[in-house]
Amino acid sequence: MSYAYVGCRTTKERNARGKGLCVYEINDQTGVWKLVQCLKTEPNPSYQTMDQEKKFLYSVHGDFTKVSSYQILADHTLKHLNTIDIGGKNPVDITIDKENKHVIVATLQGGTLYTIERKEDGSLGDVAAAYTYEGKEEGKVSTIHQCLWDQRKNYLFACAQGRINGYGQMRALRYSHETGTFTQTAQFFARTWDEPRHAAVHPNNRWVYMCEEKGNKVLYFQFDEKTGAMEAMQELSTVPETITSYSDASEVCVDPSGRYVLVSNRYTDSIAVYRIDPVTGYLKNTGFYSCLGKTPRFFCFAPNGRCFVANEDSDTIVEFEFDSATGQLFPTLNIIPTGSPVCIVFA
């Protein structure tokens, strides 16, 4: 058996149908998901991460200012430990450092990365550091949407959408494992209104791929882990040239083989696939696929190599088989009903 922890939206302001942080038991032989727990603590347990030993889980509560910690029990269900208020509005992403010392949270309207101390019992402690993306005017911020480690967990890539009062950008930040503070080593500014959203790092730690939400683009960057420098090399559309309707790029992943990049698009409800040149890192589109649902806000690869898409507005998680030789997605017809899913973490 394996397990999946599914975050969701729960509030009427989000027109959500989610009930809470859900735990599913997965039969590895049949692929069937069984709901074993739905934990109701704070609203909108939207994005999650685990500690390095997979004994604890941490969740942000989207649209609010809170972050929660949970112990993963022997039966893989969750026990709530504590919830803290970090002050920054709308935490949207969360990760943990390689020493299990600090939890890092990105806040959208807060425009700030928060470093939170992690106690010995796995619960959350005080905020140890804060790093803010300045806006166009004093008192304004650039809205951060992700905090992503490089493969060595020495640098953090943090995308900011910018929106009206800020600057659309992605920064590379060197991390101090001792203090939990960040030092900028590189910065990329996007075109106005393109809104950088999420990035993914190739296993070789030299190539980074970033999707822009409103620009509907995927960009390729070269990254130097010795200096922290990065350089934009290429951009491609995440939707076919025949698509003229509204679309928002939402998630980007490198497949487990390191051969392909995938990007999901909301409203056009599709997944774009790109082959990675194994020598140069440049991308070439190989196809577009229906996500078989509405609003694919999130997708990821499970340990078994299957791709799971969280379709927020159709209340489903859809399983696909991914052929790493051809880059094709094949629906398995395994569809898991769950309210307003926006994140999946496997254990």
Task: Tell where the protein language model's regions lie, with residue ranges.
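Short coil/turn segments that connect the beta-strands within blades of beta-propeller domains
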Residues: 1-2, 53-55, 99-101, 152-154, ...
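Conserved beta-strand positions in repeat-built beta-propeller and related beta-rich domains
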Residues: 6-9, 14-15, 59-62, 105-108, ...
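Beta-rich catalytic cores
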Residues: 17, 44-46, 90, 143, ...
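Short loop/turn segments immediately following beta-strands, especially the blade-tip
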Residues: 24-31, 70-77, 115-125, 172-181, ...
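A short beta-strand motif characteristic of beta-propeller blades
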Residues: 34-40, 79-85, 128-137, 183-190, ...
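Asp-box/WD-like beta-propeller blade repeats and closely related beta-sheet repeat scaffolds
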Residues: 78-150
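Loop/turn-rich, solvent-exposed surfaces of beta-rich toroidal or solenoidal domains
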Residues: 247-280, 284-312
